[in-house]
Swiss-Prot record:
GO MF annotations in UniProt: ATP hydrolysis activity; protein-transporting ATPase activity
Family, as annotated: Belongs to the TIM16/PAM16 family.
Higher taxonomy: Eukaryota, Fungi, Dikarya, Ascomycota, Taphrinomycotina
Region described as J-like: 59-113
Residues forming coiled coils: none
PANTHER family, A to Z: MITOCHONDRIA ASSOCIATED GRANULOCYTE MACROPHAGE CSF SIGNALING MOLECULE, MITOCHONDRIAL IMPORT INNER MEMBRANE TRANSLOCASE SUBUNIT TIM16
Naturally occurring in which organism (per UniProt): Schizosaccharomyces pombe (strain 972 / ATCC 24843) (Fission yeast)
Protein's recorded name: Mitochondrial import inner membrane translocase subunit tim16
Length: 128
């Protein structure tokens, strides 16, 4: 086989392989986009909070070792006090970790207050 013929064959085979790979990658991109659009609505609230620098509910629960689904005010306060005391800088703790604990408590407390408001029926206002 001559050199020009081998180079030509190499170019043809290479372009066939590249075109097949491109088509396959394009199909995968379309499939990923379709799959992502279905899960995007659920993740949009969480990703918005992360972009703004806010702590997510899952992260707050992880910091205080509380499951956000089974959130109770007494348990929240107990865990907060314990973690806040452990991370007190005056006792050799970390101010950064203490602030993370505080922000986690703040986030879970607001979530708990929101749940309580949603569960309690709206009180009718009496007009004179």
């Amino acid at each position: 086989m001559s050199l020009p013929r081998a180079v030509g064959r190499f170019i043809i085979v290479g372009s066939q392989v590249m075109s097949k790979a491109f088509v396959q990658a394009y199909k995968q991109m379309i499939a990923n986009a379709a799959q992502q659009s279905t899960g995007q609505a659920a993740a949009s609230k969480s990703s918005t909070a992360v972009r703004r620098g806010e702590m997510t509910i899952q992260e707050a629960g992880s910091i205080l070792n509380i499951k956000p689904e089974s959130l109770e005010e007494g348990e929240l306060e107990k865990r907060f006090q314990k973690m806040f005391e452990i991370n007190d800088p005056k006792k050799g703790g970390s101010f950064y970790l203490q602030s993370k604990v505080f922000r986690a408590h703040e986030k879970l407390k607001s979530e708990l207050d929101q749940k309580i408001q949603e569960q309690s029926p709206a009180k009718p206002t009496s007009s004179p």
